[in-house]
């Protein structure tokens, strides 16, 4: 009998606790989330982004800014040039932006959703084929250098004979790079040609000529394209010959001169670039905001190779490619 009474009292106590826990007046302050929303300011700035599909990674770039309380976004997608995005919003620590289907070659817009954890943005996006891909992004490095650069010894990247020291991006390509009469020749619609060495800061001398209606480019650290073309007279100035593609336009605008040998002398320190064309400065000590379309990766803090674009149309010829890297800075 005493055992039954004790059991009844215990059951009543458990029931009372359950009712109290479910009551609107119950004190849940000790277990409620107290994590504050991530402020909008934490999202602002330049981001080096990597988009991951089931079989490939695509380097991309994103810049978020705010003007008069309105968010703005500029993006370099899987290819092409930097472009403003039509929609971007940050709500309760959640980022959403849209890359239009026309820019992505997709059936519908690519909608990016993501959150910020520590110093990393991550999330998902609707892929061109309708599946879901993932993406991550880290703040782009400032790449600010101080002191005076000390130049090392010049290195000839092309020996005038063969492709020694270079690797094509596709080993099974139907059209390939060739050496003809001492010149490197782009395949036209073929693979890229990537140098085997990696460099951080340097001076680069390149001699080239173009067939009519042709297109190529010189990629610095494998990430920043200095454009070469005779096929884009109607493009904006920052996509024509002499430009850092999609970002920096040459001044003055350069004529297209098929069949003529021309030179680039390029100096890249951090993300500050100077470009000379045939001995005349066309881009003077300007900042490259981020990677350009076709970059090998988005890891801007790391050294990277020189690569020559072969995936565009026509034929471009290179006969001299010499790089002079820096030695450690003198403080």
Regions found by a protein language model. Name each.
Residues 24-30, 35, 39-331:
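Carbohydrate-interacting regions of secretory-pathway proteins
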Residues 1-11:
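Bacterial N-terminal signal peptides that target proteins for export
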Residues 19-21:
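C-terminal motif of bacterial Sec signal peptides marking the signal peptidase cleavage site
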